[in-house]
Swiss-Prot record:
Keywords: Cytoplasm, Glycolysis, Lyase, Magnesium, Metal-binding, Secreted. One of its GO terms (molecular function) is magnesium ion binding. Binds a second Mg(2+) ion via substrate during catalysis. This is Enolase. It is found in: Cytoplasm; Secreted; Cell surface. Its EC number is 4.2.1.11.
Length: 419
């Protein structure tokens, strides 16, 4: 008797991401004819420990990745029960046999891993988030909306990569999201008034990139927008510094706002900002090997969620170091950083056991697939980062969360969140 869940076909397809770059989509079909797909997102700012993508012609094609799926992965997965996520992911890792997934490619592997999970949930007639969460009743995570871009995501002189708003004190996700959209619109008007309409064009993640040079200029703009929109005390602020991107390893200095700061001076810089503005979230404040500096900052800012992205790269090996050193309260969760869904689950489970906040995140190069929204709800993520409320590949994730809330009546994480 044929198992209706057995994998019959795995197929790769070269598609286009939100930055106009090629990426890979992997389809998996079962013997019962059930089919779904997984897309590989791509980051602009990457940690050095991330899984390596397979690309050709200076990144202009992923034809080799498609061939790997069609000629290596397809026969290897043929006949395996699509519900066996752990077996599928282990087989992919074994075939690859490298620590950084460089043989098959992190992009190839994560697209296949996502496709397996989505196909299994579809075959069982379950929503993806329900397939992940099981019998537990999860909540809708708090959105972290990146509304001003700097660093590698922008063409201005800001060194901080993302300036974020955090709508916490609302009863529903819908209320929180639409309040954040009010602030986004208010900011757009403020930028138009001060700098001209040309600077309201949006960047890779939907945020604005006004001609700013100083961190406080950006924070002032957002703080004013929050107050003008009437959400003081309900919408807070955050930053993704992407500290590795403005760290000069030769000088051992951070180059920011026209100054060269040593690690301790940068720590004081952040302490001053948190005193001046309602900042509750700070991601990658230092370069990716500075576990001790992260720890010092978190110790001084007990009410702020210091978070590691490049510090951990969704890798349990580095998370264990952060736990031992008490480096952060929060962890970024990006499945494509580590390469498989199973490894991502291991990472989130360890973080949860150590009372750390989960922040599920997109990448700057995304597709219209809304898998990450389902994934965030399913793993009971505290927060979700999918960009500004603009551009289809970002809004598709917000719309999926609105749909889940409306259809299943899930409560909003922010309703119960205390600072």
């Amino acid at each position: 008797m044929i198992n209706r869940f057995s994998i019959e076909k795995v197929k790769g397809l070269e598609i286009v991401d939100s930055r106009g770059n090629p990426t890979i989509r992997v389809f998996i079909r079962t013997s019962d004819g059930v089919e779904s797909f997984g897309d590989a997102p791509a980051g602009a700012s990457k940690g050095t420990r991330e899984a390596v993508e397979v690309r050709d012609e200076n990144g202009l094609t992923v034809k080799r990745a498609v061939d790997i799926v069609n000629y290596i992965i397809d026969p290897a997965l043929h006949g395996i029960d699509v519900r066996e996520q752990g077996i599928i992911d282990k087989l992919l890792k074994d075939i690859d046999s490298t620590e950084n997934k460089s043989k098959l490619g992190g992009n190839t592997i994560i697209a296949t891993s996502i496709a397996a999970l989505k196909t299994a949930s579809k075959a069982l007639g379950l929503e993806v988030f329900k397939y992940i969460s099981g019998p537990r009743l999860p909540k809708i995570p708090i959105p972290l909306l990146n509304i001003i871009n700097g660093g590698l995501h922008a063409g201005n002189k800001l060194k901080i990569q993302e300036f974020i708003i955090v709508p916490i004190k609302f009863n529903t996700f819908k209320e929180a999201l639409f309040a954040a959209i009010d602030v986004y619109r208010t900011l757009k008007g403020l930028i138009t008034e001060r700098y001209g309409k040309i600077y309201t064009a949006v960047g890779d993640e939907g945020g604005f990139s006004p001609p700013l040079e100083d961190t406080r200029e950006a924070l002032d703009l957002i703080y004013t927008s929050i107050n003008n929109a009437g959400y003081e005390g309900k919408i807070y602020m955050g930053m993704d510094a992407a500290g590795s991107d403005f760290y000069d390893s030769k000088k051992e200095k951070y180059i920011i706002d026209g100054r060269e700061l040593d690690p301790n001076q940068l720590l004081e810089f952040y302490l001053d900002l948190v005193k001046q503005y309602p900042i509750v979230y700070l991601e990658d404040p230092f370069e990716e090997n500075s576990f001790d500096m992260f720890s010092q900052l978190q110790n001084k800012l007990s009410s702020t969620i210091i978070t590691g992205d490049d510090l951990y790269t969704t890798n349990i090996k580095y998370l264990k170091i952060g736990i031992e050193k008490r480096s952060t309260k929060g962890v970024i969760v990006k499945p494509n950083q580590v390469g498989t869904i199973s490894e991502t689950f291991e990472f989130t489970n360890l973080a949860r056991r150590n009372s750390m906040k989960l922040i599920t995140s997109h990448r700057s190069g995304e597709t219209e697939d809304n898998f990450i929204a389902d994934f965030a709800v399913g793993i009971e993520s505290d927060f979700i980062k999918v960009g500004a409320p603009a551009r289809g590949e970002r809004t598709s994730k917000y719309n999926k969360l609105l749909e889940i809330e409306n259809k299943f009546g899930l409560e909003y994480e922010g309703k119960y969140f205390y600072l």
